[in-house]
Design a protein with these regions (language model features):
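Eukaryotic tandem repeat interaction scaffolds
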Residues: 203-260, 268
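Acidic (Asp/Glu) and glycine-rich low-complexity loops/linkers
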Residues: 1-149, 153-168, 174-187, 193-206, ...
Length: 315
């Protein structure tokens, strides 16, 4: 009886393995033929806005007297490029068969979409990218910049007269030598880096495990939250208030300042070197405290659980 029961099980297992092998071989053959093809789009109506949605391709903007879009693609990842209603639209589409998603040999080949256009000021820029990087040089400026990426990185040196809104999963966010009205940055495990950035209004940053690194940054107010990410400030000047809430991440500031500071962390340490004196209220359950006594300046409230607290004034 047991032998009779075992026979169908063996047959089913053989069929399952054989079927999987066939699908895997089909996907392998398909991947071997997945060559990269380059296409150019020159006959485009004038545009001042951008609506770009990509799957695996990197996106790069390049200064050029000639306006064109150069697309690298494979037979598995195709693109449509159009220009209508003053908007350049680039849409990537994954057309793999379902079994090719299961057996993924060499599918993520290096491909890129490059937008060539004259230097100058443009309207809104919207980008969605799954695994590709987004790179924007300083030759361009935009009225607004909105981007959502998964594993790709965002690297921009472009000024924005309006707001910058970036959402990333594991990708890194880097802005350097730019101005903007407001910044709202969210990342899961990716780091966030701002260098030589001047923001008229507020900067808001939120991550899970990613670190924040700000250098030579100015803004009206700053707010951030993180689980395990560290916060590092170097020459960061905030007109109004700095609000930081961390779980286990450290907070370190050098040559930085704000009218008021409110910092909370659990196991991370807090080490501040502020430009002007503050009235410091430091609270820690088991951590050590080394803070100066001052009766002038704005409030500086610091609360940790086990993290040490150190505060110094430059003046």
């Amino acid at each position: 009886m047991k032998g009779l029961i075992a026979i169908p099980i063996v047959i089913g297992s053989v069929l399952l393995i054989g079927g999987g092998a066939l699908f895997g071989y089909a996907a392998y053959k398909s991947s071997k033929n997945n060559t990269v093809e380059t296409k150019e789009y020159k006959e485009l109506a004038s545009f001042n806005k951008f609506d770009i949605d990509l799957t695996i391709a990197d996106l790069e903007f390049v200064k050029s007297e000639e306006t064109k879009v150069v697309v690298q693609e494979t037979k598995h990842d195709v693109h449509t490029v159009t220009s209508e209603n003053n908007t350049l639209k680039v849409k990537g589409q994954d057309i793999r068969k379902w079994y090719e998603h299961l057996f993924n040999w060499n599918w993520f080949q290096k491909v890129k979409v490059t937008v060539y256009m004259p230097e100058g000021a443009y309207d809104e820029l919207k980008v969605i990218s799954a695994t590709g990087n987004v790179t924007i040089p300083s030759d361009f400026s935009f009225a607004s910049f909105t981007t959502a990426v998964s594993t790709g990185n965002v690297n921009s040196k472009a000024n924005v007269t309006g707001d910058i809104t970036i959402t990333a999963a594991t990708g890194k966010i880097n802005f350097e030598n730019i101005t903007a009205n407001r910044m709202d940055l969210k990342a899961s495990t990716g780091d966030i880096r701002l260098k030589d950035v001047a923001v008229t209004e507020d900067i808001k940053i939120k991550t899970s495990t990613g670190d924040f690194n700000l250098e030579n940054v100015t803004c009206k107010s700053y707010e951030s939250g993180s689980s395990t990410g560290d916060v590092n400030f170097n020459n960061v000047k905030v007109t109004n208030a700095i609000n930081i809430k961390n779980d286990t991440g450290h907070v370190k500031m050098t040559a930085s300042d704000a009218e008021e500071l409110d910092i909370k962390t659990s196991t991370g340490y807090v080490k501040l070197e502020l430009l002007t004196s503050k009235i410091v209220y430091a609270e820690s359950s088991t951590g050590k405290k080394n803070v100066p006594t001052s009766t002038t300046g704005g409030l500086c409230k610091i609360k940790t659980s086990t993290g040490d607290i150190t505060v110094k004034f430059a003046e």
